């Protein structure tokens, strides 16, 4: 059996995540290529979560996120993201771990196939009737449904949550809608005290082809594709980390186990000890085939 070490895995992650001076992301076009390479990543590094992120790819190394807004890596990260919002190059919104996530359009149908959506703009009514959507999320969704794209300030007003006392409820509901792949930011407006506010729209209107593409994908296939893509990027992870990574997709432990079992049967992944890592790790055989 092939023996792997944590050092070998970390070297491959440095390459995959573009955390090297040679592969660092230097332009907006390279940022777009990076998202298409990894298919999904976080915007920022998230403590305790193994996943590529755009900030480290721009920095070309692991570094703390600085507080200074004039830091060159921070400026590129924010600026390129804002410039790309209306380009329809990728999905950007709160998703994995309920944090800012970028997803390639090639991979987005697989995430959508695991959501509660079927592609109709009125799907939300059944979710609300079933108790799967909060009243605040319903109000925000209906404001966008009626008025089209709205900046955050006007969206709060149209959803009748403009009072300061309603801000936390509004923010939670907006994250709920993004995690549910119903709403996403599509631009930036000069609104509010800071003259900066996201412009939001309904995902099926912004990406009308995604629901139809997702209809061709079973939930089981979607889980297999996403878990395997994740392992191709991170090289190795245990079952607990995979569960944490995809917790918002509402899979049961049994569904995750079945997904992993199929990947093991296909020899797409192998479960093994890795020197320097605790417990059994699921390792991508595609990654193992590279020059680790």
Pin down the residues of each PLM region.
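Long, low-complexity intrinsically disordered regions
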Residues: 1-292
């Amino acid at each position: 059996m092939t023996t792997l070490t944590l050092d070998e895995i970390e070297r491959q992650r440095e390459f995959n995540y573009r955390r090297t001076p040679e592969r660092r992301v230097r332009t907006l076009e390279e940022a777009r290529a990076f998202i298409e390479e990894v298919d999904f990543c976080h915007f920022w590094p998230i403590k305790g979560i193994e996943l590529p992120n755009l900030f480290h790819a721009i920095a070309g190394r692991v570094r703390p996120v600085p507080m200074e807004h004039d830091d060159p890596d921070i400026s590129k990260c924010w600026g390129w993201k804002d410039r790309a919002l209306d380009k329809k190059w990728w999905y950007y919104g709160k998703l994995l771990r309920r944090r800012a996530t970028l997803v390639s359009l090639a991979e987005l149908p697989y995430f959508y196939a695991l959501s509660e959506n079927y592609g109709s703009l009125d799907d939300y009514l059944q979710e609300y009737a079933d108790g799967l959507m909060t009243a605040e999320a319903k109000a925000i969704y209906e404001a966008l449904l009626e008025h089209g794209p709205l900046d955050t300030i006007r969206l709060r007003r149209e959803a009748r949550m403009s009072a300061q006392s309603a801000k936390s409820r509004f923010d939670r509901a907006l994250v709920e809608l993004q995690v549910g792949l119903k709403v996403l930011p599509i631009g930036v407006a000069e609104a509010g005290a800071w003259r900066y506010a996201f412009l939001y729209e309904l995902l099926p209107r912004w990406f009308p082809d995604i629901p139809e593409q997702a209809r061709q994908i079973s939930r089981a296939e979607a889980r297999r594709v996403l878990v395997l893509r994740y392992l191709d990027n991170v090289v190795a992870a245990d079952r607990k980390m995979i569960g944490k990574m995809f917790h918002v997709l509402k899979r049961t432990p049994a569904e995750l186990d079945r997904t992993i079992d199929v990947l093991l049967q296909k020899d797409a992944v192998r479960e093994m000890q890795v020197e320097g890592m605790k417990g059994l790790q699921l390792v991508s055989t595609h990654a193992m085939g590279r020059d680790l």
